[in-house]
Structures are given as structure tokens and as C-alpha cells.
Amino acid sequence: MEIIVDITKEIEGYEDVVPEKIESYIKEIIAKEYPPEDRPLYISLLLTDNETIHEINKNYRNKDSATDVISFAYNEDEENDGFYEVLGDIIISLEKVKEQSFDYGHSYDREFYYVLTHGILHLLGYDHIEEEDKEEMRKKEEEILEVYGYRR
């Protein structure tokens, strides 16, 4: 199964954020967790700042604050007859990830890959609205992070 990951980095600095490593991580998780498709899967990732994610959060989610990650899953009810099977878009604020890594006492890598995993799982249909779903999603996040050595 071909998986296409389109990564855009709109923020200066953060040289330790390596697109090739991120792309590989996304592809491995999607390949393990998503049923095989006959056509290529497409996912986009935007790495940005607090100001941009705040604006997106306000405009699309009616929340007037910056956040760490926003996922827009492609609507499964809509017909997708294009060349790609579009899973959706993930937007991550690298500034917010840095803040949270300090707040929670995690390494920057651990926090970044936690947030990225969270976004990927949303695209795969996980959510955390109901407590039972939240527990299932948290368990899956920790399982994935453990495989890659990102421990708390």
C-alpha cells in the first residue's frame, strides 16, 4: 500500500524536527492500523506556530486559543473517487509542543510524537468525547509510543 505524506513546515527553527523521520513514523503507523487500500493513501501534516493554530482553532472549531494539534479527517460519507484515498490533515503547533514538553516534564521528541500519534489516531477514527473512547485512544497512543521508545 502506497502512503503519501505531505509535510509543510511554516515555522523557523526547530531543526531537530526531521521530516524524513516524521514521514517514516506516519507511514509505519498507518500501514499497521489502516486496512489496505487499492489506491495510494494521502495525509498532510502542517507544522506551524501558536498564532496560526490559534486562528485555525478559532475559525474551524470555535475555540479562541492555541492548541497542540488539530486533525481534520476526511468525511467518510463523502464520495472520494480521486486517485488518492485522502485520510485528512494534521496541524501541529511546534511552539505549543515545546511549551508542553516543559510543562509535563517530557522530552521534546516524546511530546511531539505523542501529539502526532494523537492526530493520526483521530484520522483513523479514534476520538475522546466519551470516557470509554478516551481510555481506548489513550491506551492505543501509549502502545504506539512504547514501540518507538517514547516513554513518559
Protein language model regions, located:
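Periplasmic solute-binding protein
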Residues: 121
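An acidic/histidine-cluster motif and surrounding catalytic segment
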Residues: 1-113, 124-152
